[in-house]
């Protein structure tokens, strides 16, 4: 039913809700809470528009302009809160279902690959290409290949990389650089131009012994003129032993087999010359040399730069040889050889066997000590591969002009004897 002059409201689906609010006596209105009175006095805006939840209710009732009595204040408040909450939920659901435009962020950073692709396209269109900074990042091989195709292969190699290194020897066809017609001047080292004998082809480093010996031929006087004191182990500091200490005592005992002494490879500094008996030792030789064989003065006139070793008289006894130092230790022998050049040698008594001798030699790798063993037939052999000799001077005389049969010294000979120093 409708009343004239009043607004129309939709009747709720739940019966008894509005009727209960209308019923009540004036005493009930007086005892109502202030909050309930205020909420009842205010116009119900949510009742003016039909709610989606109550759209199926077609019956409408007029709302009187006069204030309606409020019977239950708390219940009415709960109902209004429930309706407002339901309406907010519907609005939120509608907002979720409606499509929204995507927000584009201006500060988005593209990956490194995207930047490289953009620069490649800009370079192909004609704009100047920007060279990226070298930050240590390297593209994979496939990516580099694709980028090269995009850029159009601007940088092309003018000359392909050679697969092999340039040979050391120039071409033999006569064509040289800068259009010169003369062939390239060089010293031929081919086998047909080689001056060495066939048995020396396996030692290519030993070319021209004369040149090597002249290059390392430094006189001992240069060392003495230096302002600083002589180093430890110089020739002047070597002790001179009396003649009685060099005599070999005891009968000869047979040995099972000749053996090599252990060699010590100590790398030394630059090569220096050894004191030759033909220079300063000529006037200071022991007195026993003056009474010896006059042939012993022959090696004193030979030059140390000769490819052959200084001549040794094999008939002269061992005690009268200038390169025999008697009973000195291995350390003293190395100190004597330290200032001498390569292929310098001396003979001393063996420290392990009193009937044997040791040959101390200076090589390019250090010092070598080889044993001169005595066999059952009272012969002497050098190492294990040399033929037997009747005496030690014969061994020195033989290998002064021949290669040593010792492993590690096959390319060497006994060239420069280390003479004895006397005070």
From Swiss-Prot:
GO BP annotation list: apoptotic process
SUPFAM superfamilies: Nucleotidylyl transferase (SSF52374), SH2 domain (SSF55550)
Composition skew (Acidic residues), residue ranges: 192-203
Region (Disordered), start-end ranges: 1-87, 110-208, 225-312
Keywords: Apoptosis, Phosphoprotein, SH2 domain
Domain of life: Eukaryota
Phosphotyrosine: residues carrying this PTM: 201
UniProt cross-references to Pfam families, sorted A to Z: SH2 (PF00017)
Keyword Phosphoprotein found: yes
UniProt tissue specificity: Expressed in skeletal muscle, brain, liver, prostate, testis, ovary, small intestine and colon.
Domain SH2 residue range list: 323-418
Transmembrane regions listed in the UniProt entry: none
Any GO molecular function: phosphotyrosine residue binding
Modification note: May become phosphorylated upon binding to PDGFRA.
InterPro entries the UniProt entry points to: SH2, SH2_dom_sf, SH2_domain_adapters, SHF_SH2
Note in the entry: The sequence described in PubMed:11095946 is over-extended by 57 aa at the N-terminus due to the presence of an uncorrected 5' mismatch compared to the reference genome sequence.
Subunit annotation: Interacts with phosphorylated 'Tyr-720' of PDGFRA via its SH2 domain.
Role description: Adapter protein which may play a role in the regulation of apoptosis in response to PDGF.
Protein name, UniProt field: SH2 domain-containing adapter protein F
Species of provenance: Homo sapiens
Highest classification ranks of the organism: Eukaryota, Metazoa, Chordata, Craniata, Vertebrata
